[in-house]
Every structure is written in C-alpha cells, then in structure tokens.
Swiss-Prot record:
The alpha and beta chains are autoproteolytically processed from a single precursor protein within the mitochondrion. Keywords: Acyltransferase, Amino-acid biosynthesis, Arginine biosynthesis, Autocatalytic cleavage, Mitochondrion, Multifunctional enzyme, Transferase. This is Arginine biosynthesis bifunctional protein ArgJ, mitochondrial. Catalyzes two activities which are involved in the cyclic version of arginine biosynthesis: the synthesis of acetylglutamate from glutamate and acetyl-CoA, and of ornithine by transacetylation between acetylornithine and glutamate. The active site is at residue 204. Its EC number is 2.3.1.35, 2.3.1.1. The lineage of its organism: Eukaryota, Amoebozoa, Evosea, Eumycetozoa, Dictyostelia. Substrate binds at residues 167, 193, 204, 291, 430, 435. The record marks 130-131 as: Involved in the stabilization of negative charge on the oxyanion by the formation of the oxyanion hole.
Length: 435
C-alpha cells in the first residue's frame, strides 16, 4: 500500500517547478544573491531585492508572541515611514536571528543599514531572516555576503533569489502573473520559502511579492490582507507557528497604469485577483514541498453558516495528526474527520453532516455536484455511514492529490484549506533539525 519515501521525494518536488517568463518580471526590480557561509552546504544564503524607484509596501507578520529581530525591525521601519519610500529588502537564510536579544536586533539593523548604504538607497532596507532559532548570525560572513550580492544585481534571475532563501525546502518557489489595467500591463512576481512549521496564521515562511503597479498604500494593504487570507492563512503542514514569518509586497509604480486609490474599482479588483493567484500558487507549493509529505490534500467545507466557521472546521481537520496519518496510510477513516469537525468549536449538527473522499482537488464533489464514482466516494450521509469497498477507497487515496469534502448543512458558506499527510520522513527530518 505504501509508497517508498525515497520515491515520493523524487516525484513530488518536480511537480512544483513551473516555467516562468523573464520578460514578464515587474519593471524596475533587480535581485542579487551570494553564498556567505551561513549554510553548511555552501549554497547561496543571501538575497537582495532592489527597486530603482521607491515602493509602497504592505506586510503581514507572524502572530507568534516571540518575534525575531528582523520582524521587529521591519515592522518598526514600515510604521515609522508610513509604508512608503522603500527601495530594498535583504534576506538571509541559515539563521533566524530569533531569541537573540539586543545583539540580534543590532545585527538586523546592521544588515538593513549596510544594504541601503551599498545601494545608495535613501531609506533603510527591510530585513527578513530564516533558519535555526537562538543563534547569533556571523556578521562578518553576512556583511561580506551582502556586499557580494549587490555586485550580482540583475533583472532576470529571480529563481536564484528563490533558491537563496531556502532552508529545508527541496525546491525553489516562484510564481508570476501579468494583468492588463487602465494605462498599461502590470507584472507581478513572488518568491517564498517554507516546508515545515507551517500553520495559520502563517508560519516559518517568508514571501516577497513585487509588482510594478501604481497603487496607494491603503489599497496595497487591503489587497495583501485579502490575498494572504485565501492563501498563506489557508495552509497547514504541522500546526507549528514560527517566530519569523513575513509576507511583504512592494509596488514601485513603473508600469505606468492609472494610480489605484479605490478598493471598489475594476483595476483594484483585477490586481487583487492576480496577486491572490500568485500567493495561492506559492502557498500550494509550500504544501507540496512540505517536510516528509507524500500527498497534497485539499479540504473543502460546504454548507457552513459563515465563511469564518467553515475555515475553523477546515483548519481543525487539517491539524489532526490522526487524519493526516490515515491519509498517509491510504485509509478513508471518515470517523477521524468527523471527530475533528466535532471538536472544532463550531456548533454543528452531526445529523446534517455529509462527507466524501476524492482524488484531485474535489471541486466537482459534494451535494448537487457531479460526484463521479471513478474519482470520489461518499462515506457519510446526514450523519449515517454508508457501506463502501475499502479496497476501492484505498486505491482512490493512493493518488498524490486527494481531497476531503464535508457538507455541514448549516448554510451556504464555503471554505478551502490545503494540507498534507504525516509520514515517518517528517519525524526523521525534524528529529535532526535544531529548533
């Protein structure tokens, strides 16, 4: 029944990689990378993103009470400067600079000031870090790495930038999108890292989105909040929340489109949808690359009384170790799913609940849907279990992409989350990774 972990690790990451167009990257942005020695592998561990024009910026940060030095510094810089006028971002991997006290904050400031100085940027650089918690950065290495990265700045090598921010990731994560707005075509690119400690609201995950759209700070903030809710706050790998996670979007206005100031305008809604598509693809890449994962799992909740309650139920299922273990074992254990629905905290009626397992994303599964018997099976009908062929169910769940669809019978709201199964490889990977 079980596939070998080695086979899975070879198969899954390749499905994440996507083609990208170097002529569709946002105008005015450059990236530079370097290997300074923070990573024992010798791989690149410094990334700089620079815009020739000052950017409006929006960002969301970890909700963990323990926040890393770069998170504290970047929040302060953004608030002090009203989220505008930024030209650069510096990221290091190989060290989280979290739980490092005053020295850690001093090191984050050094990274910020050195980057902006070398780039001759008028405003301090934002900072992100990722890696092991509780260790001071070797600043002699970091400072040399920043200087080296500045010399490599170019407009087309975003994939190297995505590689430079990886930690336990197996593959780089990059997505892009273009959209025609009033006054010109706008380009969007996003890179992110993350494979473990992934849980709403965000987790050990860094993401930077850059666009050449002209948009106000308030509109950019609203756009990012919407996009993150339906992407990074809708994924779960292991239920752990990190100290460092950050999502930031930079907009430099180089596309020449009509400046967006109204969140109800057609241009805003089109741009918001495009950014949401980019962040959703990146979020799904994180789940597909999750530590030890062999399955990409879509959880769809229908018939909730509110979207928020649907999200709570989906989250409860996605964090259940029993559900995730059963999926790895290709066991359609609907009882574990129903239990997770029941303890979610949402007031549901068990006698109204219907449930299906399916291969793929489950979009055609549920009440009033196609429900193709070749790709889906219903296991629960208004709280009553249905007799099913367990061998056929196991075959259905042998696919790399599977779905759990739950109908609550409470209303018309829906919610979707993405998660993965729980395997021996996850335990193995995290038993050898400090903090």
């Amino acid at each position: 029944m079980y596939k070998s972990i080695t086979t899975l690790l070879k198969q899954q990451p390749q499905s994440i990689l996507r083609n990208y167009s170097t002529d569709k990257f946002p105008r005015g942005f450059k990236t530079g990378t370097a290997a300074c020695g923070l990573k024992k592998t010798g791989n690149k561990d410094i990334c700089i993103i620079h815009s020739s024009a000052p950017c409006n910026v929006a960002a969301v940060f970890t909700e963990n009470k323990v926040k890393a030095a770069p998170v504290l510094l970047s929040k302060q810089l953004l608030e002090t400067n009203n989220y505008k006028g930024f030209n650069s971002l510096v990221i290091n991997s190989g060290g989280a600079n979290a739980c490092t006290g005053e020295q850690g904050l001093k090191n984050a400031k050094t990274m910020s000031n050195l980057t902006s100085s070398l780039l001759k940027a008028p405003q301090a650089s934002l900072v992100m870090s990722t890696g092991i918690i509780g260790q001071q950065l070797d600043m002699s290495k970091v400072e040399k790495g920043i200087a080296d990265a500045v010399t490599t700045l170019n407009e087309s090598d975003w994939i190297s930038a995505a590689r430079a921010i990886m930690t336990t990731d197996k593959v780089p994560k990059l997505a892009q999108k273009s959209v025609s707005l009033n006054g010109g075509e706008v380009h969007i690119v996003g890179i992110c890292k993350g494979a473990g400690m992934i849980h709403p609201n965000m987790a050990t995950m860094l993401c930077t989105v850059c666009t050449d759209a002209s948009i106000s700070e308030d509109c950019l903030r609203a756009l990012l909040k919407h996009s993150v809710h339906y992407s990074f706050n809708s994924i779960n790998v292991d239920g752990d929340m990190s100290t460092n996670d950050t999502v930031a979007i930079f907009a430099n206005g180089s596309a020449g489109n009509k400046h967006i100031t109204d969140t109800t305008s057609s241009d805003f809604l089109q741009l918001q949808e495009a950014v949401r598509e980019v962040t959703t693809r990146l979020a799904q890449m994180i789940v597909r690359d999750a530590e030890g994962a062999s399955k990409f799992v879509t959880i769809k909740i229908h018939g909730a009384d509110t979207e928020q309650n649907g999200h709570i139920v989906a989250n409860s299922i996605s964090t259940s170790s029993l559900v995730k273990s059963a999926l790895y074992g290709e066991d359609a254990n609907w009882g574990r799913v129903l239990a997770a629905v029941g303890y979610s905290g949402v007031d549901i009626d068990p006698l109204k609940v219907c449930m299906w397992f399916a291969k793929g994303d489950g979009k055609d599964v549920g009440l009033g849907k196609k429900n193709d018997p070749e790709t889906s099976m219903q296991f629960l009908e208004k709280g009553t279990p249905l007799a099913k062929d367990e061998n056929k169910a196991a075959q259905l769940l042998s696919n790399n992409d599977v779905a759990i669809v739950v109908e609550l019978g409470m209303g018309k709201a829906s919610s979707t989350m993405w998660t993965c199964d729980l395997t021996e490889e996850y335990v193995r990977a995290n038993s050898h990774y400090r903090t």
